[in-house]
C-alpha cells in the first residue's frame, strides 16, 4: 500500500495557481527537450508566437487550442478548457468551465 499522496488538477491549482495553455506548452516542450523552433513546428505555431504564449503575453483561441492538442495527441478538451478559462480571467471573470465534446450534427 502506497502512502504517496496523489494530486488531481484542483490540488495542483491550489498549490501552483491557475494553469494556462502557455504553462502547459512550456512544460511539455521542456519535458521533451525541444527547442522553441522544433516545438513550434510540431504544433504549427511560429517561434515568436510560441514564446509569447509561453510567457503569457498572448492567448490561444479555443480553435487553436484544439489544433495544438491534436498535434500533441492529448485530449482537446483539456487545452480548450484552459483557453476559455484564460479568456474569462483576462476579462476579470472568475469562472471554471467544463468542456466536453459533442457529436457533430449531419448537414
Features from the language model and the residues they span:
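DNA major-groove recognition helix of helix-turn-helix/homeodomain DNA-binding modules
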Residues: 4, 44, 63-78
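Residue-level detection of the helix-turn-helix DNA-binding "recognition helix"
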Residues: 30, 44, 55-57, 84
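The alpha-helix within a helix-turn-helix
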Residues: 29, 40, 69
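Residue-level signal for the short linker/turn that defines the boundary of a DNA-recognition helix
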Residues: 20-23, 33-34, 60-63
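Residues within the helices of the helix-turn-helix
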Residues: 26-27, 37, 48, 66
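N-terminal flexible/basic segments that precede or flank functional cores
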Residues: 1-23, 27, 75-81, 87-107
